[in-house]
Curated annotation (Swiss-Prot):
This is Glutamine--tRNA ligase. The keyword Repeat does not apply. Glutamine--tRNA ligase. Plays a critical role in brain development. It is an enzyme of class 6 (ligase). Signal peptide: none annotated. Monomer. Part of a multisubunit complex that groups tRNA ligases for Arg (RARS1), Asp (DARS1), Gln (QARS1), Ile (IARS1), Leu (LARS1), Lys (KARS1), Met (MARS1) the bifunctional ligase for Glu and Pro (EPRS1) and the auxiliary subunits AIMP1/p43, AIMP2/p38 and EEF1E1/p18. Interacts with RARS1. Part of a complex composed of RARS1, QARS1 and AIMP1. InterPro entries: aa-tRNA-synth_I_CS, Gln-tRNA-synth, Gln-tRNA-synth_Ib_RNA-bd_2, Gln-tRNA-synth_Ib_RNA-bd_N, Gln-tRNA-synth_Ib_RNA-bd_N_1, Gln-tRNA-synth_Ib_RNA-bd_N_2, Gln/Glu-tRNA_Ligase, Glu/Gln-tRNA-synth. The gene is QARS1. ATP binds at residues 271-273, 277-283, 457, 486-487, 494-496.
Length: 775
């Protein structure tokens, strides 16, 4: 139908021309509305009143199953459904009863068909509602919430027409109160809401304080905003748009509920061929978090169907990272646990003429329009014999595959279900020489484990049709697959292949190099798991792909470490300072608070002797305007000591370089307060400190338009600076790998696993404040 004809058809339903044009832009909606209007005209003629047109538009815009369109249009045109309330009930009924035939008697009862609500009943219901609120209504008059009266009347008369209820409320209120006065016409003053008491479950909005991003945490339920809040209840899979039903669906769902008891079940299914990265953290939080928020369970299932790329170290590392983020799987499973069942189902698929053995080579299947398989229609018995021959090792790799008979969303035809691989499996050894593919394994493992919500990233959307098709082809329980947007970061690469290239090029040490965004790297750098979880919560779960700035993740890190990392003092570029009038014959013991803002968290003790070390940058012989630290005629305080030092003599070497300072000291309360207090160390430990910056110079190192030479050409030469002879106070002497500290005025640091009894090694996790140049 031409656009002008459709426009005329839609305006004939009572739509404004603007609304009709907007509707035409939505191809799915316009097609369904066109069909509904055409069917209605066959009964009512070309003239359709606006009330009926409104119902038809509501039907077309909200109906998920086009098979029910004619059925519902007939109820609208016959006036059996004549209110919005009835239409909503009808749509809910067909959504909850996806299989034929519809029980019309039950349907009509649920939708109020034939129920007549008289004006007298409406009058009585409104009168009863007004009487319940009469006293308050007389006081507040027209400032009273009339919606409350209409809501109570509607609750008493479910199938009453909403417009009639509103009209009756208006009439009775006017009769009780009389016409509106000038006071009634004044706007009701807004009452400021009382500020709720602070709780642990805060919102995830960013608060900017003094130019810094302060990130607040979220509860699990607050994380699951957006589309996730619309998820189906267990057993109501058929209510999900696009879910495919068969005559067996309802029986299978009943069996599913008998097994699970209506429990929410999710799974996190990584491939054990690499290390998890920040994007996986979102998937872990979503799957485990959604299950936990709904009192459900989450499986950790290793998709170990490609023995060529799997290594034992990856299984261990993945499990460790899940635990590190604070989650405990209900059960750890493996796709290989189900190899026998998967094989039996593959045989059954062939018997049902839904799969066949194919001899096209891998290169023949690549590209956008590969040739159809000449073996697609081979006899069932022949495919059964050949598939058994595949299992027995009678074909070389690439000579035969088992393919499923379906076309996927992206146009890919007949995806491979099994292929030959003569590689021993880490769990099953040489038992198998054929292995199932992801397209075949994923949905069936979900079915076996009775997963209720199969949560995947958007790249798997093209495989949703094969997911539903395969479960239904075998008549097994079919879970719901739901896709969400990936989480990516600027200035990062997370591809396993590209990380291996970085390692091979010597740009990073290994998968856990602190400049990477793998979870093992972030842990080594000192990122707390709570910060990563908070970051994932802040990002939320949406359908759109999300690319975030690293400084937002770092803000989450600061937020956690500020409350959890005890303070210590360290000097990166030491300058010796000798106090010539030190007030004691031996070092003083100074009590330093672990957390200056909360001294109830305890203290640690550091020595303060006649020789201390300060940062070289905290002294200048010729300071520029605004410089507040140590200089001639400008004393400075030493943090936590209660003392102020003043320059007495500068000791220089043969080259003129400052080697040490001689100063005098006085009590801080014995004179004018200095302009600044600096950190220091005395009788310190020598340590190595590694200072990290971004690994790449551009936001999108993989984008050829931004980095024509490829990501390896975009490496930041200053991404790592090693300070081999830094000094740190002795309070950290017993620190263990991954212990975290705030080195005052320097940043947050974590003990690196390279540390040994002879020397500690610290990684700078983040600076105290974000560098404005990075934001």
């Amino acid at each position: 139908m031409a656009a002008l004809d459709s426009l005329s058809l839609f305006t004939g339903l009572g739509l404004s021309e603007q609304k009709a044009r907007e509707t035409l832009k939505n191809t799915v909606l316009s097609a369904q509305l066109r069909e509904a209007a055409t069917q209605a005209q066959q009964t009512l003629g070309s003239s359709i009143d606006k009330a009926t047109g409104t119902l038809l538009y509501g039907l077309a815009s909200r109906l998920r199953d086009p098979r029910r369109l004619s059925f519902l249009v007939s109820y609208i045109t016959s006036r059996k459904i004549h209110t919005e309330t009835q239409l909503s009930a009808a749509l809910e009924y067909v959504r909850s009863h996806p299989l034929d035939p519809i029980n019309t008697e039950d349907f009509e009862q649920e939708c109020g068909v034939g129920v007549v609500v008289t004006p007298e009943q409406i009058e009585e219901a409104v009168e009863a509602a007004i009487n319940r609120h009469r006293a308050k209504l007389l006081v507040e008059r027209y400032h009273f919430s009339m919606g409350l009266l209409m809501g109570e009347a509607r609750a008493a008369l479910k199938w009453a027409d909403g417009k009639m209820i509103k009209h009756e409320v208006d009439m009775q209120v006017l009769h009780l109160l009389g016409p509106k006065t000038e006071t009634d016409l004044e706007k009701k003053p807004k009452v400021a809401k009382a500020r709720p008491e602070e709780t642990d479950q805060r919102t995830a909005k960013d608060v900017v304080e003094n130019g810094e991003v302060v990130v607040q945490t979220l509860s699990l339920m607050e994380q699951l905003r957006g589309e996730a809040l619309k998820f189906h209840k267990p057993g109501e899979n058929y209510k999900t748009p696009g879910y495919v039903t068969t005559p067996h669906t309802m029986d299978l769902l009943k069996q599913h509920l008998d097994i699970t008891g209506g429990q929410v079940r999710t799974r996190f299914p990584p491939e054990p061929n690499g290390i998890l990265h920040i994007g996986h953290a979102k998937a872990i939080n979503f799957n485990f978090g959604y299950a936990k928020a709904n009192n459900g369970i989450c499986f950790l299932r290793f998709d170990d169907t490609n023995p060529e790329k799997e290594e034992a170290k990856f299984f261990t590392a993945i499990y460790d990272m899940v635990a590190w983020l604070g989650y405990t799987p209900y059960k750890v499973t493996y796709a290989s646990d189900y190899f026998d069942q998967l094989y039996a189902w593959a045989v059954e698929l062939i018997r049902r003429d839904q799969a066949y053995v194919c001899h096209q080579r891998g290169e023949e299947l690549k590209g956008h329009n590969p040739l159809p398989s000449p073996w697609r229609d081979r006899p069932i018995e022949e495919s059964l014999l050949l598939f058994e021959a595949m299992r027995k090792g009678k074909f070389a790799e690439g000579e035969a595959t088992l393919r499923m008979k379906l076309v996927m969303e992206d146009g890919k035809m007949d995806p491979v279900a099994y292929r030959v691989k003569y590689t021993p499996h880490h769990r099953t050894g040489d038992t198998w020489c054929i292995y199932p593919t992801y397209d075949y394994t994923h949905c069936l493992c979900d079915s076996i484990e009775h997963i209720t919500h199969s949560l995947c990233t958007k790249e798997f959307q093209a495989r949703r049709s094969s997911y539903f098709w395969l479960c239904n082809a075998l008549d097994v329980y079919c879970p719901v697959q739901w896709e969400y947007g990936r989480l990516n970061l600027h200035y990062a690469v997370v591809s396993k292949r590209k990380i291996l290239q970085l390692v091979a090029a010597g740009a990073v040490r290994d998968w856990d190099d602190p400049r990477l965004f793998t979870l093992t790297a972030l842990r080594r750098r000192g990122f707390p798991p709570e910060a990563i979880n908070n970051f994932c919560a802040r990002v939320g779960v949406t359908v759109a792909q999300t690319t975030m700035e690293p400084h937002l993740l770092e803000a989450c890190v600061r937020d956690v470490l500020n409350d959890t990392a005890p303070r210590a003092m360290a000097v990166l570029e030491p300058l010796q300072v000798v106090i010539t009038n030190f007030p004691a014959t031996k070092a003083l013991d100074i009590q330093v608070p672990n957390f200056p803002a909360d001294e109830t968290k305890g203290f640690h003790q550091v020595p303060f002797g006649s020789t201390v070390f300060i940062e070289r940058m905290d002294f200048k012989e010729e300071p520029e305007p605004g410089y507040k630290r140590l200089a001639w005629g400008q004393p400075v305080g030493l943090r936590h000591t209660g003392y102020v030092i003043e320059l007495q003599h500068v000791v220089k070497g043969p080259s003129g370089c400052v080697e040490s300072l001689k100063v005098t000291c006085r009590r801080a309360d014995a004179g004018e307060k200095p302009k600044a207090f600096i950190h220091w160390v005395s009788q310190p430990l020598t340590c190595e400190i590694r200072l990290y910056e971004r690994l790449f110079q551009h936001k999108n190192p993989e984008d050829p338009a931004e980095v024509p030479g490829g990501f390896l050409s975009d490496l930041n030469p200053a991404s790592l600076q090693v300070v081999e002879a830094a000094l740190v106070d002795c309070s950290v002497a017993l620190a263990k790998p991954f212990d975290k500290f705030q080195f005052e005025r320097l940043g947050y640091f974590s003990v690196d696993p390279d540390s040994n009894q002879g020397q500690l090694v610290f990684n700078r996790t983040v600076t105290l404040k974000e560098d404005p140049g990075k934001v």
